[in-house]
Amino acid sequence: MRRILPILVLALGLSGCQMTSVPATVPARVEPVAVTPKRLPSRVEEVIGERENPRVVAEFGGVYRNPQVEAALVKVVSRLVAASDDPSRHYKVTILNSPVANAFALPGGYLYITRGLLALTNDSSELAAVLSHEIAHVIANHAVARARVIEQADIVEKVASDVLSDPVAQQSARLRSRVTVARFSQDQEVEADRIGIMIAGRAGFDPFAASRFLDSLEHYAEFRSATGSRDEPKSFLASHPTALERRELALRAARQFGAPGTTPGDRNSYLAALDGLVYGDDPGEGFVRGREYLHPRLSIRFSVPEPYRLENTKEAVLAAAGPNTAMRFDGVPVPADTSPSDYLASGWVNGLVDGSIRETTANGLPAATAEARAGDWFFRIGAVRVGSSMYRMIFADRSSDEAIAAALDETLASFRRLTPQDSARLRPLTIEVVDVKPGDTVASLAARMQGTDRRLELFRLLNGLGEQDVVSPGEKVKLVLE
């Protein structure tokens, strides 16, 4: 598999990564919510932001429109800007239509937050903690500074490659340059945390919300992880400090404003603005419902067995069952008379095991399976043709092919067409804010959640509740419902 297998192996290596803030330079039209300026920033920053903004918006699913949430954002940003050291800056805030929890900034005052991250916030102070961190990146010119450091590192690597004849010396020079970039990025994150907490505290928000929300993000990373591990080893090449380091530094900065619990909360009024927020996948990209994937436009569905966890992306549907086992599902156009077995034998699979192709069916649809080996990886591949589309299921495991053989068979057996009635009934998930009534418990409220097979975990995550926390009558909580 010239492209698919290396990509899948790379995805396994990156499965534990999560960014909460990046100086973005990635890929339309956008009309961001604006905070009225007194003075524009430098033209250089403005040009960079204007150039990169359309690519960022396109990469993250476009702009998500929600007047209630936009009003809440403008209110929070206005207070933060007024409390910053440069209240004359102009900021443009965009909600991105992405289910992934992320926020970042571009030079020129472009601030971005995904609807996936908004779903995790539980009061305006937590939202302020996110936005003040990104405002700090803008004020400190972090994106431009980091670009210069990366450029210098690239020069070092090129010199090492062109001038040094000793491979060990070349590798040492490259490693030193990468460590320099990583340490610089970590320092930027710590500085943005410190500046952001100072801004939020001066604006009257709870300064301890930053450490609280960092904990929520760590729980979010755990929830998304197939292994459920929160004990990721710290890499000296990581661009962010560890969550524990950031929480400790955030608490230290917050204590300058006093003790925790002295800032009035606004949970109930804030959650009212999130009522109706789309949660999870965009309808145009299909839906993940627990271990099931459904695409109303393509009229297909399939499910994966335990313990696989599905993730929908623009390029493919991915699943993982631990650090060394994964699945990728995608589709490619083919002539309508192409058989799945001929397609598997057409040369796109590197390491195809001779004689391993087997013809079969998937609920009446023509299908075929095959085996492949690449290095120390085992692969089981399935192909199903629906009209002029060939859908591919690629399972990979680093130790054995027995488990993935069974997983492929089960997934292939679940693949079928959706009827027009099935497709019409599919609706996106939304955040619904409800009042806790007498007799309600965490367990009873979580049981009402839809679209997930991990209801209790997701309910606690969305509402910022620990394992021992309870709910009280009169408070508001978030549910995920169709």
Question: Model segments located where?
Answer:
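Primarily a LysM-type cell-wall glycan-binding module
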Residues: P420-D453, E475
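Surface-exposed aromatic
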Residues: V93, A101, L111-Y112, M327, ...
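A Zn2+-metalloprotease active-site environment signal
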Residues: R2-P6, C17-H295, V304, R309, ...
